[in-house]
Amino acid sequence: MKDYQQAAKVLRDTNLRQGLYDEGAVLMEGVLVNLHGEKHRARRGLENKVFRRGFFSHYEKDVFPKTLALTIDQFVSNGGGDLVEFGFRALINLTCDFAGVDRPQASQSETDRLLSLMRAFALGTTLAHSKDDRDKVRQQVSEALSAFDVEFLQPSVERRMSLIRQVEARGGEEQDLPRDVLTVLLRNEDQIELDGAQLVREMAFFVVAGAQTSIHSLVHVMHEIFTWSDNRSERIETLRTDPMLVQRCVHESARLHPSSPVAVRRAECPVLLPTEQRVETDEQVTIDLQSANQDEKIFGSRASEFDPNRQFDKGISPYGLSFGLGMHACIGRTLAAGVTPKPDTDPVDHQYGIIALIASALLKNGVRPDPEQPAEVDAKTERPNWGRYPVLLGSNPSSNPH
């Protein structure tokens, strides 16, 4: 299915359940994005308690800038490096914060360990598109889950359970507890079906989903920015001083490069699709997100081109269907991509999203592709992602980032 409006209707159809992650059940079985119906509503309702109004603004304006400054200062002092690796390091601590995974050592070696586990989890989320031996990948993911449970999750659970007992004993309030997904799940475990193994998968999924998608989005948008600004000094200077333009670049790149090029749904019962095709129970429907996001009826005759100044009809998201619709719309979309600005939006108070914040920081530090080291696509997956993207930072004899 490639038509934008038809794809949007299918994504909203509650008789079609998530089907993209069936192959990666070793990690994805029973996690939020794979639940359907009442179980999904119950779990999402709880986890939405973390992502209340003000949460995204707090993280974007108060928490993330400190983490980003530490990471980018090291990147600048090194004169650059691999943009993919930088993205992982910039985002891993943030995602652990809102997931509820403690890092008591706050050390380089601890971050390295988390990153190695997260990369293994990422193989589980993309198993349907893997080019490697899938049984070996499943074993690798399973071993990473066990290590994550022992090294990080159980200590985090024990600390939160102790805090929960203390707060409940003195009649305290919810605001006295950590504001993260793990705390919410532990406080409400009697309301949902979530055994020990399932909790490990849920937390691992939050860690990888929060970082991996944003990392790939970051590298894609920087590549698009490098291409769009090539030999145009006025564009480069505007990008360095106009965060609204950078956010539009993020949205436009997300439209062209959804984290998964397709969405998959399975029918819970017989369904008549917008194409007038009938789908029987348990049959699969594939939505071509990449094509739908480039539907010329919606995005114009040059829909396949990168244009951060593109105009949209009312009701059309600038990032297309890349963050999903309906019950499986991305729970962290506002954190990643910010809020779509209105004509009267105040740039000072606006939520740009962490991808735009990182991109702006890189641009202000003179980021540009490393001419001696070409970027490489990720050969381990069929997804069109960058596996390595060397860049330079700091002083540049030319004002051009390309």
Where are these predicted regions, by residue range?
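N-terminal membrane-proximal hinge/A-helix region immediately C-terminal to the signal-anchor transmembrane segment
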Residues: 1-24
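Cytochrome P450 heme-thiolate monooxygenase catalytic core
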Residues: 58-209
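Conserved cytochrome P450 K-helix E-x-x-R motif and the immediately C-terminal K′/meander segment
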Residues: 237-277
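Conserved cytochrome P450 K-helix/beta-meander segment immediately N-terminal to the heme-binding cysteine loop
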Residues: 288-318, 323
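Cytochrome P450 heme-thiolate "Cys pocket" and heme-binding signature region
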Residues: 310-389
